UniProtKB/Swiss-Prot annotation:
UniProt name for this protein: Protein phosphatase 1 regulatory subunit 14B
Role played: Inhibitor of PPP1CA. Has over 50-fold higher inhibitory activity when phosphorylated.
PTM comment: Phosphorylated primarily on Thr-57 by PKC (in vitro). An unknown Ser is also phosphorylated by PKC (in vitro).
GO cellular component terms listed in the entry, alphabetical order: cytoplasm
Compartment(s) where it occurs, according to its Swiss-Prot or TrEMBL record: Cytoplasm
Lineage of origin: Eukaryota, Metazoa, Chordata, Craniata, Vertebrata
Composition-biased stretches (Low complexity): 1-15
Organism this protein belongs to: Rattus norvegicus (Rat)
Molecular function per GO: phosphatase inhibitor activity; protein phosphatase regulator activity; protein serine/threonine phosphatase inhibitor activity
A biological-process GO annotation: innate immune response
Family: Belongs to the PP1 inhibitor family.
Length: 147
């Protein structure tokens, strides 16, 4: 992996580049401390701080991400069956897995999902039971796991 910046340098965030620039997200620049070696061409004679482009990423457990993706695909498949329609026609509802994982018990999770599916005319018990089985043991994705 490439060097992400000099030790002790400050990270500066810049807004996302304009359309047509080929880049999609915000850029992060690392500023070298004054007098640091490798200040780039021109050395200390440059007018502004030397900026070096780097990437910042948040690491999530790939296995957990794969489980979450599979779960979301399963949920979509089940909802199309429950509502007897195409994915685009499913009523506006959001089953927040992280919210369910925060709840104390399966009973409260089941009650929450039942609230969300109140407009569904087909029986939802099998879906709710399957969903609770699938999320058991999963981890929240809102904060990365430290290794």
């Amino acid at each position: 992996m490439a060097d992400s910046g000099p030790a002790g340098g400050a990270a500066l965030a810049a807004p996302a580049p304009g359309p047509g620039s080929g880049s999609t997200g915000p850029r992060v620049y690392f500023q070298s401390p004054p007098g640091a070696a490798g200040e780039g061409p021109g050395g200390a004679d440059d007018d502004g701080p030397v900026r070096r482009q780097g990437k910042v990423t948040v690491k999530y457990d790939r296995k957990e991400l794969r489980k979450r993706l599979n779960l979301e695909e399963w949920i979509l498949e089940q909802l199309t069956r429950l509502y007897d329609c195409q994915e685009e026609e499913i009523p506006e509802l959001e089953i927040d897995v992280d919210e369910l994982l925060d709840m104390e018990s399966d009973d409260t999770r089941a009650a929450r999902v039942k609230e969300l599916l109140v407009d569904c005319y087909k029986p939802t018990e099998a879906f709710i039971s399957g969903l609770l089985d699938k999320i058991r043991g999963m981890q929240k994705l809102s904060t990365p796991q430290k290794k």
